[in-house]
Amino acid sequence: MKTMIISSSPNRIGLTNSCVDTCIKTLQELNVETKWIVLNQYNIKKCEACGKRGWGICLEEHICRMEDDFNNLQEEMGEYDNFIIVSPVYFYEMSESAKTFFDRLKRFNDNSKIKGKKIVCIACAGGSGTEQKKH
């Protein structure tokens, strides 16, 4: 079994990455192959809603015309059985990098590389996860 963990926090020492560390440790104890993807380290542009009625070649050819890291990441996702998505909560929403990624992934609907696969989403709220300094 292979699980891809996708996180979307730019803070390398915060609560979100602490959750990722726990997931990785637990999965490794269960002998599950894991890969950690940090969305903020990828060049993933916002969807431009190209083509007719805002649907470009993504609807028919199942690839995006934009030249960034999205197509390769989506292709790699097809090699995994399960996904854990971990995002900080910013202003009652997932992070911008997570939102951008999901907006692009959604354009592929029924032909997505992750169709039928299991996904767990973890929303991390409540602070940075680092110790607070007292003044």
Predicted regions: what is each one?
Residues 1-108:
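N-terminal beta1-alpha1-beta2 submodule of the flavodoxin-like/Rossmannoid cofactor-binding fold
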Residues 96-97, 109-135:
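Short, glycine-/small-residue-rich phosphate/pyrophosphate-handling segment
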